[in-house]
Amino acid sequence: SRCTHLENRDFVTGTQGTTRVTLVLELGGCVTITAEGKPSMDVWLDAIYQESPAKTREYCLHAKLSETKVAARCPTMGPAVLTEERQIGTVCKRDQSDRGWGNHCGLFGKGSIVACVKAACEAKKKATGYVYDANKIVYTVKVEPHTGDYVAANETHKGRKTATFTVSSEKTILTLGEYGDVSLLCRVASGVDLAQTIILELDKTAEHLPTAWQVHRDWFNDLALPWKHDGNPHWNNAERLVEFGAPHAVKMDVYNLGDQTGVLLKALAGVPVAHIEGNKYHLKSGHVTCEVGLEKLKMKGLTYTMCDKSKFAWKRTPTDSGHDTVVMEVTFSGSKPCRIPVRAVAHGSPDVNVAMLITPNPTIENDGGGFIEMQLPPGDNIIYVGELSHQWFQTGSSIGRVFQTTRKGIERLTVIGEHAWDFGSAGGFFSSIGKAVHTVLGGAFNSIFGGVGFLPKLLMGVALAWLGLNTRNPTMSMSFLLAGGLVLAMTLGVGA
């Protein structure tokens, strides 16, 4: 699956009868959804971008100077005049020069002198700013069912589907083929202040340099370089790249300050690099909060017969996925399609299946299958696939796993923020409380009771509540009632 190849992976486990779960998706992360009686899915935020954002300013990094002209007057003859002074696109400077008999003036003294030069910009030497429009930013969410096929990190799963969202998007329904339909309703949020963010892009050259950066608007507007708006042929403040020498009689030299690309690149050291793909300008941070509807999903292969246990062979022996799960792949030489008999037992309990399958109902298909992912309790275990067996030691501890999943649940609830609560009605408020409990404690509950059936969990919750009602000690009574209520809520709830 896609999530097994990413470092930032989260698990959301639906309870019995779950029809809807709430996910927090961020760039670079991936969430695996598991629910009893439903196929597992990987969901991730693939990209945040805007196509062809509006230009704000263009800066010139290297001036192109031409048509230099100088005019001078003798002392007492008035100011020197050039018609170019009144022309747009020229840079001029007035000064005083020493005049006398040696340079054709009858009087000694200071005479007026003016120099003008036409200023343009060298080709491929512009830095352009682009601004984002929050209403036009597209958030791409991808969904991939766990089909039992191994897919390498650089390959694309044939069942992968894509949904796009903006601030005004409605619910999207994706068809996952034989696995049914899944609905997505996502609220989007960028991770940057779009009003104060500019994408600074250099003209593309053959140099192997970053071409775009994500900068602050005030910093961008304060750049001491010639600038113009898109479509305007003339540069404002072109004198910033022009230097005039000291005047000598009727002569004033004009100097080009040269290419400022290196100076700009030095100033951009440490600034986040922006990713541009064609006309898509990507944001580096942001998240979406999605309500995922599972009610129309269906399990594939429930009508298959069980595979012949003696005809399996390891293709990839069990391996740690890096996400507190175990992944493996088998081949099968018998009649296809069929269901893979897979289980795991802990040391000292040979009759209790302790495997929590991330790949539900693993199957061998005519054209693939055989990839299995499972979660095992910490300690010594034996994995069985048909007649194959493999000794496995799962690192960690049950308490540590509970704390880790609870911490992630609190992080999810924090990111969802105000959207997690509905104060419009009493029913909505209590529903919000249920969702919050599932978001924070769902992973921990699954870690503790993952191998316990629905009926035992229900009876346990009822028993704890009954003890709470019949205990005379107030502290013990409240403790039993709270524990029983949580077990019942997590067992019977349909929101996660």
UniProtKB/Swiss-Prot annotation:
GO terms for molecular function: protein dimerization activity. Residues 469-479 are cytoplasmic. Glycans are attached at residue 154. Residues 1-447 are extracellular. InterPro entries: Flav_gly_cen_dom_subdom1, Flavi_E_Ig-like, Flavi_E_Stem/Anchor_dom, Flavi_E_Stem/Anchor_dom_sf, Flavi_Glycoprot_E_cen/dimer, Flavivir/Alphavir_Ig-like_sf, Glycoprot_cen/dimer_sf, Glycoprot_E_dimer_dom. Pfam families: Flavi_E_stem (PF21659), Flavi_glycop_C (PF02832), Flavi_glycoprot (PF00869). One of its GO terms (biological process) is symbiont-mediated suppression of host innate immune response. The keyword DNA repair does not apply. Residues 98-111 are annotated as: Fusion peptide. Disulfide bonds join 3-30, 60-116, 60-121, 74-105, 92-116, 92-121, 186-290, 307-338. The keyword Glycoprotein applies. Keywords: Clathrin-mediated endocytosis of virus by host, Cleavage on pair of basic residues, Disulfide bond, Fusion of virus membrane with host endosomal membrane, Fusion of virus membrane with host membrane, Glycoprotein, Host endoplasmic reticulum, Host membrane, Host-virus interaction, Inhibition of host innate immune response by virus, Membrane, Suppressor of RNA silencing, Transmembrane, Transmembrane helix, Viral attachment to host cell, Viral envelope protein, Viral immunoevasion, Viral penetration into host cytoplasm, Virion, Virus endocytosis by host, Virus entry into host cell, Zinc. GO terms for cellular component: host cell endoplasmic reticulum membrane; membrane; viral envelope; virion membrane. The chain crosses the membrane at residues 448-468, 480-496. This is Genome polyprotein. It comes from Louping ill virus (strain K).
